[in-house]
Amino acid sequence: MSYLVVTIKVILITGMPGSGKSEFAKLLKERGAKVIVMSEVVRKRYSIEAKPGERLMDFAKRLREIYGDGVVARLCVEELGTSNHDLVVFDGVRSLAEVEEFKRLLGDSVYIVAVHSPPKIRYKRMIERLRSDDSKEISELIRRDREELKLGIGEVIAMADYIITNDSNYEEFKRRCEEVTDRVLKNG
């Protein structure tokens, strides 16, 4: 069952925590894309259904166990509804099951873009940004990386249609993002 007759392009953003996924999504939004942040969709559900003391990542794992590995993708497509955007972006894809679910629901104009940044740079960013799910301890950040890899994020990164390396300054990262976006919009 497809939710949209796809004449749009869909970008699935993946990458390890702190790699720059959200920055890429923000740049795409500035270009007029509809952006859905997958973790926000999960957080919305978490606020209603989480068990006392349950971590967000554990809640997401439980959702997958109950509803299948593509559940977060389905929830995100439901959140999308009907869209009149030429470009739709899902920020935070973590498994091939999610990729397959997006393709099943949205058609073949789906492109995976991985944002890559070396671990030392990512850890420094995460310590500086201090999101609620970030830790100040390197050991905790390494543990989180391992959890993400167990979910299958490495497989999604390996299957990426495009990879943006985020190891320089913001202007260079922005240039690389624009280059990849232009390629997706032009050719796919």
From Swiss-Prot:
Keyword set, alphabetical order: ATP-binding, Nucleotide-binding
Entry-linked Pfam families: AAA_18
GO molecular function: ATP binding
Residues reported to bind ATP: G15, M16, P17, G18, S19, G20, K21, S22
Keyword ATP-binding: yes
Organism superkingdom: Archaea
Family to which the UniProt record says this protein belongs: Belongs to the UPF0200 family.
HAMAP family for this protein: UPF0200
Matches recorded under PANTHER family: DEPHOSPHO-COA KINASE, UPF0200 PROTEIN MJ1399
Protein name (database record): UPF0200 protein YG5714_1176
